[in-house]
């Protein structure tokens, strides 16, 4: 499918989430979708784990301290087949806008770092999970499986993809996205402290500036994509909610001002937001600009040697229990997107919801 729109306006969210409060998180999500719609945007990108906010406390606590916070976080995470998700999908429909949404997904007893791509009709075009939680994130989140790996989809605003946090640094994830001809990318980031907090031996890669100004433009250059980097911000009240009892409170400003948007040649396209800025970063996208960069270096095409270097990708779901298919032979698999209820068209989901 060729894109219908080659030129359009897009937005990246640079704002504070509704910390560990599902209802407030949904309200803020719909608010920013509405604001992007009013501004004439065709696409809006949210940060990693926007709902219900990134659990930054996990970097500060020991096991015992984590348990009350972990319980609250789980209680305020978002089930995919829920009234809250349908409200967000309906907001996308009302504004006729594509939405890349990052959230903590409840699936049975586990949580996952999930992204969905919602269409202007409110249907789910892509459901993916971060393939590996980073370091202490494994205290909270499980890993994605084969059928939640895909990040790039064809839409009428181009081939659009999204990844979470350090997936944007992963050379294999970038190579896979490049092979699919990605044109517009969401590098979704959570909450990161600034470089002024860095203490050896913590590496520089673990501060905001490294990811905002090195990792993100590198993704744009290497894939030839418009790369939107939505980012979470935090206030003094948010710091309190993220700080376990007995821990020192930090200055919220060290976390803010890192939202970015880069062109397919790596140029910064928007001014760096002020530390106190909360809102949307806007960009005018022209898909033909991608061709200029890709004509020089298309690592998914003419500038690669698959006869020498190839990447093996397995997109099959790995189930804990596998059932034999006695009719067709082999085994039966249930797609994750079907099992969590996201493949149901919004019209049907709304009807079922109204009947219950």
Curated annotation (Swiss-Prot):
Q: Which PROSITE patterns match?
A: CN_HYDROLASE, NITRIL_CHT_1
Q: What Enzyme Commission number does this protein have? A: 4.2.1.66
Q: What up-regulates or down-regulates this gene?
A: By cyanide.
- The EC category is lyase
Q: Name one Pfam family in it.
A: CN_hydrolase
Annotated keywords: Hydrolase, Lyase
Superkingdom of the source species = Eukaryota
According to its UniProt record, which protein family does this protein belong to? Belongs to the carbon-nitrogen hydrolase superfamily. Nitrilase family.
Q: What do we know about how this protein assembles, alone or with others?
A: Oligomer of dimers, forming left-handed helical fibers.
Q: What is this protein called?
A: Cyanide hydratase
